[in-house]
Amino acid sequence: CALLDHTVVALISGGGMAVVTSQVLDVLTPNARRGNLHVMPTSGSRYYRWDGTQWALVYAHDLSEATVAAVSESLERHARELGLWEQQVWGPRIENRGSQITFSALGQFAPVSAKQAWDSDNTKKQALVEAVKADLPHMRARAGGYTSVDVSECGIDKAYAVRKLTQTLGIRADEMVFVGDRMTPTGNDYPAVEAGAIGVRVENPQDTVQLLDALLARFDTPAR
């Protein structure tokens, strides 16, 4: 909330709008400057702005039913073949987020500790990414969170979101700072850097909090 008092913020998440709403939007204070927040869930393939009363949809690139079925089938088949179809899960393994299909090996609601331990070197996720890409070369598959793989249309990713923001805000991409934990070339945050944004890599939520605290301290320090 405090950051919105000082600057424009874009929330570009691999999660769907329901997750973004429950984890972020629903906990904003009544006086938060929502007009300074650009909400871009499912890796930027959807875009919402506050219209004074609610979060209004600006655009959505939803997948066709045939594409959803093909992606879901490929994810499940290869996850089983690779031994990634875990028996203990917390929530659905495969989610249709409208404009993106996400595979979560332990389920969307798995404990963070379990997620962090599942694929610490990213080899499991990357193996699934490569298998799905071989099936569906016209789609983009990338490692998402600790246990997830995101599949969307080629060209509709966080780079697309950055380009949309440059148009909306009238600024250059290199005037944006993009903070993310998947900044390797195979990660779903990397396209934002490819689009020209300044990338800042964090490892976990605690890193992000420390970064925000330091940034807010700079805003609150009087100019000399």
Feature-to-residue mapping (PLM):
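Active-site phosphate-binding/coordination module
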Residues: C1-W90
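Terminal peptide-recognition signature
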Residues: S13, V39, F103, V162, ...
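Short, solvent-exposed loop/turn segments at secondary-structure junctions
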Residues: M17-A18, R46, Q108-A110, T147-S148, ...
